[in-house]
């Protein structure tokens, strides 16, 4: 049996965008730092990495659609933080950003990673943005890197 899987290395020419929601920026800025660190550690070049800022997580799918449609990027890493409050707003935003990113990703043959935190508290967000639970931005970019390699292997 042949096994096809992606590798965790870049050749340096891959053009990657990070979409980052500014809302809850204390958390999302740390996710961006983690994603950038992963990209550079695995062979990416800083000049091939773009950061696209959107107001909040709800706007991520719209920006993702534009980025993938323009053919400038090989992959996109989506980052944000939706923290539960006392209203149903959390449920609506979490569901729509998740469905939106999935729907857009399926329209294009390019790697997309979902690094949007959906958490019950600011403490959980902090844990996932670089403390106890690692940095989910780093993990999302590692997913992008592996998918870039996998997509390349599947083309050949």
Swiss-Prot record:
Pathway assigned to this chain's UniProt record: Cofactor biosynthesis; riboflavin biosynthesis; riboflavin from 2-hydroxy-3-oxobutyl phosphate and 5-amino-6-(D-ribitylamino)uracil: step 1/2
Keyword Transferase listed: yes
Binding annotation for 5-amino-6-(D-ribitylamino)uracil: 23, 57-59, 81-83, 114
Disulfide bonds: none
Residues at which (2S)-2-hydroxy-3-oxobutyl phosphate binds: 86-87, 128
GO biological process, one term: riboflavin biosynthetic process
Enzymatic reactions: (2S)-2-hydroxy-3-oxobutyl phosphate + 5-amino-6-(D-ribitylamino)uracil = 6,7-dimethyl-8-(1-D-ribityl)lumazine + phosphate + 2 H2O + H(+)
Active site per UniProt: 89
Enzyme Commission designation: 2.5.1.78
One GO cellular component term noted in the UniProt record for this chain: cytosol
CDD domains per UniProt: Lumazine_synthase-I (cd09209)
GO terms of molecular function: 6,7-dimethyl-8-ribityllumazine synthase activity
Keywords: Riboflavin biosynthesis, Transferase
Function: Catalyzes the formation of 6,7-dimethyl-8-ribityllumazine by condensation of 5-amino-6-(D-ribitylamino)uracil with 3,4-dihydroxy-2-butanone 4-phosphate. This is the penultimate step in the biosynthesis of riboflavin.
Record PANTHER family: 6,7-DIMETHYL-8-RIBITYLLUMAZINE SYNTHASE (PTHR21058:SF0), 6,7-DIMETHYL-8-RIBITYLLUMAZINE SYNTHASE DMRL SYNTHASE LUMAZINE SYNTHASE (PTHR21058)
Family membership noted in the UniProt record: Belongs to the DMRL synthase family.
Protein name: 6,7-dimethyl-8-ribityllumazine synthase
Name of the gene this protein is made from: ribH
